[in-house]
């Protein structure tokens, strides 16, 4: 699999299980790009929804994607600390055009004190039935959710102290 080069700008595209484009983030800067891990950053980035509406992100963010895990993690740097938004999703693929993944609706919001909240369980159930998620996918997603929660509790990976700050410092060297 090809991987994006550090310093390059790529778009990030999330899809739904049925193949429909869900959301696109334009111009994220790649800070690390390997076959297994991609770390990107963006600030005041244009986001385009599937219905054509668009908005601009409000704060700098560090985005973590892994080819093995069924989740991605966005660390948002705000005045009162780092907030994380975690998407339960397929592992990423990079096709030379964009970083792509399937969004499976379940999300976890993590607060600066590392407490967290599971979001969108109702949306997950609705889409699971509507798009007929296979039972094996449902099982994988719930197993991966448990791994993600373990990472949060253990301060592992992007949740480790200084991870987001250190990558943000790297991002500033590209500006």
From Swiss-Prot:
Catalytic class of the enzyme: hydrolase
E.C. number: 3.6.1.15, 3.6.1.6
Residues holding Mg(2+) 2: 105, 107, 120, 123
Binding site for Mg(2+) 1: 87, 103, 107
Record field: catalytic activity: a ribonucleoside 5'-triphosphate + H2O = a ribonucleoside 5'-diphosphate + phosphate + H(+); a ribonucleoside 5'-diphosphate + H2O = a ribonucleoside 5'-phosphate + phosphate + H(+)
GO MF entry, a single one: magnesium ion binding
Known cofactor(s): Mg(2+)
Active-site residues, record numbering mapped to chain: 23 (proton donor)
Entry keyword set: Hydrolase, Magnesium, Metal-binding
Superkingdom in the source lineage: Bacteria
NCBIfam families (UniProt xref): PRK13662.1
Record HAMAP family: Ntdp (MF_01568)
Family note: Belongs to the Ntdp family.
Role, per record: Has nucleoside phosphatase activity towards nucleoside triphosphates and nucleoside diphosphates.
Listed name of the protein: Nucleoside triphosphate/diphosphate phosphatase
